[in-house]
C-alpha cells in the first residue's frame, strides 16, 4: 500500500500559503507531524526552551503530511517527520529519503520500535470504544460486537485510510486464520459500518448514534474520557495490536544537528513524559504512563509478508464490505 500516492490535492496550496513563514524562519527547525497537535506544540515548546532553536510545526493527518512531502520534493522544507503509520517510515527509508540516526536516548526503546533510521515517538493501541450510555451490554471481546444488541450500532475505521486499522485485521488473521474472516463477515452481517478515518469512526459513538467502535485508536478516546465523554476503552483479552508512531530525520534537512537534538529531546525523560500526558504509551520502557502500557496488553502477531500481503488483506476486506 503506497501511502505517498494519496491525498496530494490541497497539499501544494497549503505549502504555498505557508512558504512565507518558512522563508522568514529559515533558521528554524521544521517538524511535520501527524497526531495530537497539542503534543507537537508541547514538545516544540520544551525543545525551544532547552535549546533556543525555534520550531515550525505543520500538523495534519498522515495522508496530508505525506502528500505535502511529495509536493515539496523540488524544495524540501521538513527536517523531522513524525507519522502515525510505521508503513510510511519503511517506505521513505526504501526511497532513500531518511538520514540514519540512533539517539543515545533510544536505549530504553524496545528493539521492535526502532531502526537505524527511525524510532517510535510514542505508541497507541487499538481497542473497542464503547458508549456506556448506549443501552448495550459492555463488550469484552471483538466477537461481542456481532451480538444482536449491537446490530447496526458499530463503526470501524477504514483500513485503507488507517494503517493501524489494517494492522488489526492482519493481527487477527495471523492469530485466528479463517476464523478472523468469519468474524469480519459476521460483523458485516450485523451492520458494522466503515466510517472513514479514526476520528470519523469515533464521532457517532461520542454522539450516541452508534454504540461502539471496532478497532479504535485509544489515545483519542482517553482524551475524550478526560473531557467528560461517557465512553470506555476495552482491550480484548484475546489480543490486539499496537501502532508505534515513527519519528525520523529527512536526508534533505538543512538543520541536521538541530534535528538530531530534537529527536534526543523527544526521547528524553521530559519529552517522553509529554508523550504520556497526551495519553500515548511512551516509547521508552522506563517511563510510565496514565493508561495501560505494553505489559498490560496481549499483542497479536501483526507482521505481514510486506506490501503485497497488506494489499491482499485490504482488498479482501474491501470486497467483503462492498457486497450487499
Which residues does each predicted region cover?
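An extracytoplasmic/periplasmic, membrane-proximal ligand-sensing/linker region
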Residues: 178-182, 283-324
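Mature extracytoplasmic/periplasmic domains
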Residues: 250-305
Amino acid at each position: 500500500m503506497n501511502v505517498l500516492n494519496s491525498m496530494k490535492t490541497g497539499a501544494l496550496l497549503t505549502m504555498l500559503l505557508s512558504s512565507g513563514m518558512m522563508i522568514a524562519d529559515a533558521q528554524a527547525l521544521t517538524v511535520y507531524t501527524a497526531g495530537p497537535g497539542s503534543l507537537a506544540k508541547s514538545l516544540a515548546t520544551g525543545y525551544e526552551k532547552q535549546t533556543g532553536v525555534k520550531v515550525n510545526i505543520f500538523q495534519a493527518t498522515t495522508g496530508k503530511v505525506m502528500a505535502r512531502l511529495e509536493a515539496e520534493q523540488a524544495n524540501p522544507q521538513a527536517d523531522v517527520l513524525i507519522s502515525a503509520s510505521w508503513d510510511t517510515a519503511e517506505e521513505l527509508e526504501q526511497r532513500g529519503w531518511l538520514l540514519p540516526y540512533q539517539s543515545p536516548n533510544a536505549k530504553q526503546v524496545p528493539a521492535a520500535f526502532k531502526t537505524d533510521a527511525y524510532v517510535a515517538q510514542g505508541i497507541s493501541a487499538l481497542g473497542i470504544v464503547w458508549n456506556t450510555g448506549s443501552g448495550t451490554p459492555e463488550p469484552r471481546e471483538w466477537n461481542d460486537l456481532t451480538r444482536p444488541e449491537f446490530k447496526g450500532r458499530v463503526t470501524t475505521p477504514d483500513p485503507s485510510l488507517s494503517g493501524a486499522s489494517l494492522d488489526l485485521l492482519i493481527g487477527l488473521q495471523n492469530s485466528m486464520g479463517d476464523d478472523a474472516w468469519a468474524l469480519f463477515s459476521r460483523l458485516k452481517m450485523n451492520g458494522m459500518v466503515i466510517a472513514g478515518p479514526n476520528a470519523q469512526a469515533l464521532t457517532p459513538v461520542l454522539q450516541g448514534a452508534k454504540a461502539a467502535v471496532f478497532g479504535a485508536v485509544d489515545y483519542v478516546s482517553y482524551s475524550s474520557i478526560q473531557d467528560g465523554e461517557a465512553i470506555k476503552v476495552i482491550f480484548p483479552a484475546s489480543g490486539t495490536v499496537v501502532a508505534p508512531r515513527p519519528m525520523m530525520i529527512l536526508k534533505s534537512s538543512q538543520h541536521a544537528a538541530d534535528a538530531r537534538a530534537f529527536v534526543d529531546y523527544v526521547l528524553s525523560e521530559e519529552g517522553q513524559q509529554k508523550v504520556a500526558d497526551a495519553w500515548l504509551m511512551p516509547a521508552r520502557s522506563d517511563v510510565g504512563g496514565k493508561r495501560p502500557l505494553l505489559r498490560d496488553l496481549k499483542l497479536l502477531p501483526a507482521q505481514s509478508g510486506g506490501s503485497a500481503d497488506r494489499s491482499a488483506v485490504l482488498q479482501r476486506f474491501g470486497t467483503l464490505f462492498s457486497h450487499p
